[in-house]
Amino acid sequence: MVRIFLTGYMGAGKTTLGKAFARKLNVPFIDLDWYIEERFHKTVGELFTERGEAGFRELERNMLHEVAEFENVVISTGGGAPCFYDNMEFMNRTGKTVFLNVHPDVLFRRLRIAKQQRPILQGKEDDELMDFIIQALEKRAPFYTQAQYIFNADELEDRWQIESSVQRLQELLEL
């Protein structure tokens, strides 16, 4: 039985690598944010606005516990999920946890392109975006680094890099 949790900051490649890794292992892939949106028929942004951060984080925790009941699955968490309640401890207890570590410059490049799809980043100038990323990583590092495995996910720009990363991740997890 395998249950793998991919954690990391937004833009780290949790969904990109998670889908490819699940395909390689021939197991389902669950993106926790997508799962929440399907269950509640609202975007994460709408739920966050409607319930506030505390309400959203509680809902996220409950949904994390729900998806953790599935076996033989790759789960990507939201970027903040490991940082609240006992979520990181829970994931470490119920599966294999991987922190997708990405250099801030790489995150900046990825998120700069994807700003329109991420409401929290809209309207940020380049220098503000870089400061935002660095500050968030500093706050979240104590949680992310509790993962059982730390994996460099800087190179996910094309199919070959993704395939190579999947192979490296499979070797790291000894699967």
From Swiss-Prot:
SUPFAM superfamilies (UniProt xref): P-loop containing nucleoside triphosphate hydrolases
Cofactor names from the entry are: Mg(2+)
Identify the CDD domains for this entry. Answer: SK
What EC number(s) does this enzyme carry?
A: 2.7.1.71
Q: Which residues bind substrate?
A: D33, R57, G79, R140
Q: Per its UniProt entry, what is the enzyme's top EC class, as one word?
A: transferase
Q: How does it assemble?
A: Monomer.
| Protein family per UniProt | Belongs to the shikimate kinase family.
**What's the name of the protein?**
Shikimate kinase
